[in-house]
Amino acid sequence: MSKNINKTNTHLEEALSDFISKISDDSNKNTDLIAKKFLTQLEKKFNFQKKDIASIFSHLEGVNHNHPIYINKIPFISFCEHSMFPFFGEVSIAVLPDKNILGVSKFSDLVNNLSSKLTLQEKLTEEIGEKILQYLEPQGTYIKVKAKHLCSDLLSPENSIGDITTTYANGIYELDSSLRAEAALNMS
């Protein structure tokens, strides 16, 4: 199995190196090293997701807190499952706890974990909310993801668009429009 992976990586490096040579003005560049470095960094990003999501939520604390908690502007980068181009931006999370809270850095860990794969912004937004609901068991969550998609800029610059915003609500945030409005206000 390891030999097949190494062989595949070698083929990818060679193909990418050839591609870089064709699109580069500088024939003196060491395209083999550039290709290898690019693929190594890409592999690191995708391997980050291997972390078990349940381990992110292993340090729950019993708490008597019945007011919303807002975690704003967690940066992320992911890759579109349609085009493989990156999209990047910020995730904001509103959680109305029930019995448990989570350390603030754990929300960032969750976002990094779930964004380390080919996905769609809409799927990422929902998946973040669903995982928090599943593991933290809050009264509800409201998720806002604002991102820039490079596919629109690179594939069709004349039709380039600004940021795309997606939202997702579950639990009490799905039922109570005033809580959603409060969350949206705290995320701006």
Question: Could you tell me what each predicted segment is?
Answer:
Residues 1-188:
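A domain-level signal for the structural core that forms small-molecule/cofactor-binding pockets
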